[in-house]
Structures are given as C-alpha cells and as structure tokens.
Amino acid sequence: MKNNFLDKVKDRLIISCQALADEPLHSSFIMARMARAAYEAGASAIRANSVVDVQAIMDTVELPVIGLDKVDYSDAPIYITPTIKEMRGIAATGAAVVACDVTGRPRPHGEQLATIVETMRTEYPDTLLMADTASLDDVKEANRLGFDIIGTTMYGYTPATEGCNIADNDFEYLKQVLAMSKAPVIAEGKIDSPEKAVTALKLGCHSVVVGSSITRPQLIAKTYIDAVNEL
C-alpha cells in the first residue's frame, strides 16, 4: 500500500529546504531549523537534499518529506538522485517520496531509468516516486514508467529550457503538463510569488513547491540589493 503523502499535500504548499556545499546555510542542523520554521508557518511537507538533511529534518518536524540527493558524476549531466545508489539511500531514510531527474539525459554508469524504477518498486513499494521533468517529452516518459508524481522542477534548468519560466505565456507550459500528465502534478521551479503559487493550484496542480524565494536568504537579499543598486 502506498503512503498517504498525496492526501496530506493536496492544495497546499510544500517548502524546499536546501543549501548546497558552497552556500552559507549548508548544514543539516540549519536545514532542520529551516524546516521547523516552515512547519510553524503551515507547510504541508518539506523537500530536502541529501540523506543527512532528510534524516535531520524528519527528526525535527512531523512532516512528510520529498527526498533527493544531488550528486555530480563526471560521466553524466544529471545530478538529482541520478543512480540507484542515491535512490536507495533516500528511500532508506523513510522519506515519503523520492524525487529524481527525468529529463531524458544520460545517467551515470549507463544506468537506465526504467531499471531504477523497477528496482525501487520491488525494494520500496510504499515509497512514492516523483519525476523532476523539464519538457512534455519528459512527462510522457514519466507517464510510461508509472511515476506517482510529476513535477515541473527542471523546466528552465536544462540547456534546452534555459530562460523559460513556468509563468510564461499565462502558464501555457504548465497547462500542457496538466493536460498530459497521468499522475498528480506538483508545480515547482521559479514559483517566486504567492500569486504564482495560487495560480498553479487554481489551474489544477495537486500542490506547489517553493524554495529559493523562502529559504535561500542570500538570493532573497540580492533581489533587494540589485534594486537598490540601480538607483
């Protein structure tokens, strides 16, 4: 039986609490406190990166977690939970959802996404799988492989979609994803205002993930500093 993550996040906000190694808030302790702040604000779930951060957050707040593991490999361009090793590692924490790159690009060591999905279904049957997609072709592939959740996470973050924004052309891309997806859609990626989040939900998204505009203060501060410096 699958877990009840989707029931818990329906029409609600998920907050991403992530800080990479080169960022000032990089610390599992700090991410856990950030998750606590998100919890107190009313977040329905947390999206988090790395086994240690996921575990620290789960030890701190009673919220479901979308877990991922960003790892760079020299033989492949993708980095969000790219191999079965990272998938297993995140699932073993007890995270409700494991998210991974589903952008059609090569995976490290020649691993095949279909094989990874099949293995996860066998070893972690109660764990939901979220496809971090960047294009309609990616959504089709996620449908074919039976992902439980389809995210727009990578739209605007791949070479083919660089510069794209989910709100472009009155959210036309998101509308197409919603029409095509066979699984609940979670809007993610450049949702940088409450208005965008509300629009995504009104269009039919199951829930919305917001990260940088809430939990990355160096980026938030820069928007103010850039505006002031233009005077």
From Swiss-Prot:
Its EC number is 5.1.3.9. Pathway: Amino-sugar metabolism; N-acetylneuraminate degradation; D-fructose 6-phosphate from N-acetylneuraminate: step 3/5. The keyword Isomerase applies. It is an enzyme of class 5 (isomerase). GO terms for biological process: carbohydrate metabolic process; N-acetylmannosamine catabolic process; N-acetylneuraminate catabolic process. GO terms for molecular function: N-acylglucosamine-6-phosphate 2-epimerase activity. It comes from the Bacteria. Transmembrane segments: none annotated. It catalyses: an N-acyl-D-glucosamine 6-phosphate = an N-acyl-D-mannosamine 6-phosphate. Keywords: Carbohydrate metabolism, Isomerase. Belongs to the NanE family. This is Putative N-acetylmannosamine-6-phosphate 2-epimerase. The gene is nanE.
